[in-house]
Amino acid sequence: MSLLKVVGLKKSFDGLRAVDGLSFEVTQGEVLALLGPNGSGKTTAMNLISGALRADAGEVWLGEQSITGLPAHRIARLGVARTFQLVRVLGGMSCIENVEAGLAFRRDHRFGAGARNEAIALLTRVGLAGSADVLARELTYIDQKRLELARALALRPQVLLLDEWLAGLNPTELQQGIKRIRELRTQGLTIVLIEHVMDAVRALCDRCVVMASGAKLAEGDTRSVLARDEVIAAYLGAPYA
């Protein structure tokens, strides 16, 4: 049974169709990659799923509940958390306060000493054990990504949406990031990720959905999809297919 189901999503901006009838499903515990060249509609699709944008048409289902058209904060409380392509941390707050904000926002509203202990555990989980009282704006870009992940995990999501979370990492950081995502998967978390690092996609993802010009170009298991001529052509041009 699918945990996340996207049916016929459409979104246009000033007559330009950014997402054109996109449909796919993700099962419990699966890691699915949403791929495509720059401008293919991937982040717009993720914004539609998370409620950051309202779709012109189509439906999004979380389990048996429609989350179509709900505002982002309600979708987050129902169990869909995300990170962003351009990192969004609360720069004037400490790392632990950023994570505590996520804890306060979820359904069981954690506050006080219990929330602090859980926030420290989440910071430790993403590799920020010694940064609890550091202002978020003082972190490196990579550590801000880790903080954003900790804040998303504070919501105890059913589905985690990662928008290029592995981008910009050096080889050592990339392997650490892949390991972290694998650990989340072993804990039963369902993950949809946008990624251009193909080594990470091959290492992590069960299936791929490839977009081009807003529409779905291909879907299937990772190895076979990445070998398809039309997918290679979408990324590199027809002469390389």
Q: At which residue positions do the language-model features occur?
A:
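Glycine-rich phosphate-binding loops of nucleotide-dependent enzymes
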Residues: 2-241
